[in-house]
Amino acid sequence: MKSPHSPSFRFSIMVLALSSGFAHADNVRPEATAELKEVVVTGTAVPTRVTRNQLDRETSTDLKQVMKDQIGMDVGGGNGVAQFYSIRSVGEDKINLEVDGTSQSTKIFHHQSRFQLDPALVKSINVEKGTGAASAGLGAVGGTIRVTTVDAKDLLTDGKPFGFKLGAGLSSNKGSTGNAAVYGYQNGFDALFAGNFLNNRDYKDGNGNVNRGSRLKQHSYLAKLGYDFNDDHGIRLTYRQEYQKGNRTDKAEFQNVDSYVGVDGTYQKEQSYNLEYRGRNVGFLDKIDANVFQINTDDTKPPKGAPSPKAHASGTAQGGVPIGQLELSKIKATGANLNLASSFGDGHMVKYGVNYRHETSEPSDKGAWLKILGLYDRDKEKKAEYGVYAEGIWNLHPVTLTTGLRYDHFKYNAASKQSASHGQLNPSIGAIWDINDNFSLLANLNQASRAPRLNEALLANERAGAAADLDGNLKAETARRAELGFKWRNDNFNVSGSVFHQRIKDLIVYRWAKINNNTASITERGKIYNGGTLKTYGYELDASYRWGGLTARAGVSYVKPRLNGEMYYGESPIQAEDHESSFTFWNTGRQWLTGLSYQFENPKLEIGWRGRYAQSVKYTDVARGQGTIHGKKAGYGVHDIYANWQPLKKDNLNVNFAVNNIGNKQYRSHSQRFPDGNGRVPFYERGREFALGVNYRF
């Protein structure tokens, strides 16, 4: 068996990495370490990743639950798009969600997430933390959640040409789920059709309070058709749909409280179409990965000014808008990627390619509002961006050096009919030094830029869009991350860690226009410009020990973000350097993870315990009716127990059980809005819940 530390194995990992990162096979059993498919490629020493095998052994139904024992990424909030994502505290405006090479950067509304992802359809999730290297793709300033969906070959068992998968789950906190898939692969043809259905009613938090507005009906579909011409060439056509429907207000992140209540029928639907080609060993090219895609997002919600109970009785919302009249906003992203790799000499490789994306938004119709404000001359928002890159991996045993250069360019056409364009070069460099078979060091310095996003689709026809002027000298945001890390492995003991510093300059500010509601006039136009800097620094440490069937783990992460410059939240300037929001960052502070599990061989049963802890941290925010709040997020400690039983002693049948939040703790995640406002109350996390799930492939 080839040693995992031999030069050829180390290079095979780097062929996959192709970036200024750290590559290793983490926490796999000794007999599996030589399998290339087990290798995890990550941009930092402490990995954040999840595989299909892990998901099948859990009761998780959303990405928040999937990521709760991962270091460096947080998800907080209610259900569905009420959840906010962050990577090392950096918010969604600076991070990417890439699914099978498809992505978009436009958001509907700052009171909801722009990400939708059902883990039931996923093969693997790898989180690239912080500023990416040259090959990381468009806009990789804060990190990328890189997702691969399942293929037929991932699910087939015992050499069969076709198969089925069935699954179901129940939660004591008013939730149920069911899923089914049929798939096959024969004579080069493969097909997969999968669906997942989730029904969550309003859940209770740790104090027994019902968090109204957390109710969610969700379905997701995945369809794939493909053909492998031979072992080196294949094409795939994929359709993916994510659909969420609930009883929400116009601001999904808040509960339905007092007179601020939701409306049935609000929904978000995302549909993506993706055509992929995979080629290997084509002349001087070792690898060709290419795709073209389109993503369409529809969002309906109540008009601004949520209906009150009295308005429900009369059939109209505040402002005289009928209850049944929901506003529809649309986003479309179309793009293509071409990624190539060539090897030469004594274990050297160059990766190079092109990324392209075009985005448009169609705001909800606010004709009456626009007429009042005199905003007649307006356009749809649109943006085009492309990037070209080259990246080299140089085998200088015992050092592997990576160097990269990327050029990105954008052109942005705003609703105000004004435009801006800008191009920028971004270098990256990194090194891995294998001091010996057990100890490695890494260092990297990455730079990346991110084009401005389109205005929020819901607001592009008013104060945040048509009434805002675009700075003709607008530039892309530029991020630079420096990181030092290590990994040490000795028999069954593993320790990895890193320290990092990241700076994002020329932050793009979307300052809204000021409107006098009494006179229905614009008193000051808004502006889109470069206005600030976001600095984050911190560290991560992860340690694990395995002895027979026993595995113990402990980890810690710490991030301190600071915001400076002429920054605005809406029409108001920020009040402090720790003023958080979904636009920039969440103060996640210092967080700890602990775990202990034991794997029995007969019966094939794993039982475990997980502890999650967050220390209190200061923050600044604005709450409705409360003004500026300089507060402290309460710390918390939450414990879960879980079990996975495989009755057939194989991974095709899993029976899963969990008790989450055993102590019934009432708490809020640090990766979401924290303070209560008048009628604007953010969601708490779920209280104690018992969860049971089963999945079977045959």
Predicted regions and their residues:
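Extracytoplasmic beta-strand/coil segments of soluble accessory domains associated
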Residues: K64-S103
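Surface-exposed extracellular loop regions of Gram-negative outer-membrane beta-barrel proteins
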Residues: Y243-K245, K251-N256, G367, K411-N413, ...
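Periplasmic-side early beta-strands and strand-to-turn transitions of outer-membrane beta-barrels
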Residues: A152-D154, P161, S176, A180-Q268, ...
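Gram-negative outer-membrane beta-barrel transporters
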Residues: N395-L401, F500-I504, T523-V622, G663, ...
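N-terminal periplasmic "start-of-domain" segments of outer-membrane beta-barrel proteins
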Residues: T33-V66, F84, E92
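A beta-strand signature from Gram-negative outer-membrane beta-barrel systems
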Residues: L117-K165
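Outer membrane beta-barrel strand-and-loop segments of large Gram-negative receptors
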Residues: E327-S329, A333-L340, E381-Y389, L474-K475, ...
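Flexible loop and strand-edge segments within Gram-negative outer membrane beta-barrel domains
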Residues: R212, D232-I288, N296-I331, L373, ...
